[in-house]
Amino acid sequence: MSPPIQLGLCCLNTKLRSQKPTVFMSRSMIQKTMEDIDGIDIAKQRSFQNIKDIKTMIDWNIENDINVMRLSSNIFPHLSNWKMTKCETMVDPILFEEYQTLDWCRTELEDIGKYANDKKHRLTFHPGQYNQVGAQSREVYEKTILDLGLHAKIFDIMGMGPNSIMVIHGGGVYKNKGETIDRWKRQFLEMPEAIRDRLVFENCEKSYCIEDIIPISEYLNIPIVHDTHHYTCFKHYNPTVNQKSADDLMIPVLDTWRRRNIKPKFHISEQGSGRVGHHSDFVEVIPKYLLDIPIKHNRDIDIMIEAKKKEQAILRLHDKYPDLVE
């Protein structure tokens, strides 16, 4: 039986990345290389190696009591490149369209998806912050649909279930949060079902606190990812806003997951040496209100460790909190 709280790895394993041969899932290339005559073939070769290394990373995780991992959004170089999609570059449009279908790597994606499912290894995505569901610009919104749609397509080909979510932020407020929230709701409902089925909403450090997104979640039936560091940073950037205590927010947050029958996921990090919001190398303390959830609210949860030292930070927390290890 798995422990009620499991810690998750974000995209990179520092140990595997530094070894020879190196293991990681985000080999990429500059656009100019992609535009060369053999650019698509090079992109495919790097993608195949990225997919192969996902299995190696899963195996390492399992050996070290890690059963949750965020996949990189850069497994496939330039997959959602807007200019290439719109045939505004030197890339052969027919070759690029075929590249975006992912049919050329369907077997490899199906195999790694089956492997993850067989190992009960949860995989998630956190697409980039340039994705703006509430965008004013139609082009920005269409770029968002393209990128999120390709993320969803990867999971669908892999055969991943509803626990394989895509976490996004609210984005900008465009000088009027109320109007933006209305537009966010409307444009979310315009998105393809494949995207809507996997999208979850995370609070951010400046624009959208948990209490801003609870009504959106309830209206659209979207789960909420509570980020502990963003919750703290929001107080710094919005000193006049009185947020409820994090402990008091747990019931409505957990309810958003219960309604969809998806395992709740949280993000934790701590302040680093840079600007407010910068992530530290390690996480020293898991908030008590998260540790209390399995007993207090009868829910198992996953916690993504957003620390710069990646798996090293998780192993240190396993030592500090031995109950988190099977």
Language-model features, listed with the residues they occupy:
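Short, glycine/acidic-enriched loop or turn micro-motifs at the edges of active sites
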Residues: 129, 205, 230
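Short, charge-patterned binding micro-sites
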Residues: 166-171
